Amino acid sequence: MRKVVGSAYTLTSMLKNEGALDEVVELFMEKLGGFADEQAAFDFGEWLEMFSFDGVGTVFFGSPFGFIKDSIDYGGYINAVHTAMPLNSVVAMAPLWLRPVILYGGIAVPRIFKAIMAADGIRKTAVRVTEIAQARSTDSTSRRTDILSRILSIKDERPGSLTINDVHVEMWGAVIAGSDSTSGALRAIFYYLMKTPDTMTRLVKEIDAAFANGSLTHPIRYSQAIKLAYLDAVIQESLRVFPPFAVPMPRYAPAGGLEISGHYLKSGTKIGMNAMVVQFNKEVFGEDAHKFRPERWLESKDRYRAMNKAMLVFGAGTRTCIGKHLSKAEMYKVVPEILRRFTVRMAHDQPWKTRNATFIMQSNVVCRLERRSDE
């Protein structure tokens, strides 16, 4: 299936929706401006998640869900994902034969039943939105650029390549994986910026200079933002020290087995690597790999390539995250836009709280915003 729908997820395909994503970013800035004007502490981490959900809605379905506009957890999706994710992580890591046992046996456990129902609520949304898209004329669908329309066009153009259930599953996965991964990354970026004021100052200076010399314009284009060296270094380093997806990514040893670092693995052995471990490898990232230091990404092109090759935040090889272009577009567009307009500070001196449930969920990212005088 991945090969069939792959063209819908290319960077070129994603950026056809950049104008619509700009509207989500601008609405988000208006909401953040309200918090700045009120001078009130607010849950910045939750709002970053709401932005991520609306970004997914816009690019995948053609319009935002309404999280930002209505200032609510639209449809209870955030609560549903957070409730379902611990169960999903257990099911995903369990052997195939054990998965139905966990799901069906869990119905008798209130917490697990609640998680199953929460996940099913998102599935029903995916089905409903797909049915609406199917009701459009074929000609109308072919002119649209959202990913759902692109996938439905592929289904029509290549009979037998996809079932409608395949489309439902694809959209269900997009809502869950596309939102939590990006919001987790954004929370990490801003958390580490706030914890390292010198890094924040340097990045803001780069953004201001880019606007002054015209290399950044409004709205910020993804093609412009990725050329900012220090912005890229900050995002890369944040993803390195705190990857939003941190579980072993299982693979099976091939026929005949193989040897890795002096250890023989027989055929069929299940093995995996965790980004949270790999991305702290001192041989690749340096003796100070435990530290948040974006400057390591600026030391040389060769070192950048070596470190980037070792990053597992979006997976690797044929199993690279298919939605990574959307996630990166949201990050590279919204981070400089926020820092151009606002000074962001933690509202307390407490550390954030984290919980790993496949996606690492962070909380207690409570902030205050102040409009910048030169905004």
UniProtKB/Swiss-Prot annotation:
Pathway: Mycotoxin biosynthesis. Its EC number is 1.-.-.-. Disruption phenotype: Abolishes the production of ACR-toxin and impairs the pathogenicity. Does not affect growth rate of cultures, sporulation, and spore germination. One of its GO terms (molecular function) is monooxygenase activity. It comes from the Eukaryota. Keywords: Heme, Iron, Metal-binding, Monooxygenase, Oxidoreductase, Virulence. SUPFAM superfamilies: Cytochrome P450. The keyword Transit peptide does not apply. Its cofactor is heme. Gene3D superfamilies: Cytochrome P450 (1.10.630.10). PANTHER family: CYTOCHROME P450, P450, PUTATIVE (EUROFUNG)-RELATED. Gene clusters encoding host-selective toxins (HSTs) are localized on conditionally dispensable chromosomes (CDCs), also called supernumerary chromosomes, where they are present in multiple copies. The CDCs are not essential for saprophytic growth but controls host-selective pathogenicity. Although conventional disruption of ACRTS1 could not be accomplished due to the high number of the copies identified in the genome, the high sequence identity among these copies of ACRTS1 is likely an advantage for RNA silencing, because it allows knockdown of all copies of this gene simultaneously. Belongs to the cytochrome P450 family. This is Cytochrome P450 monooxygenase ACRTS1. The gene is ACRTS1.
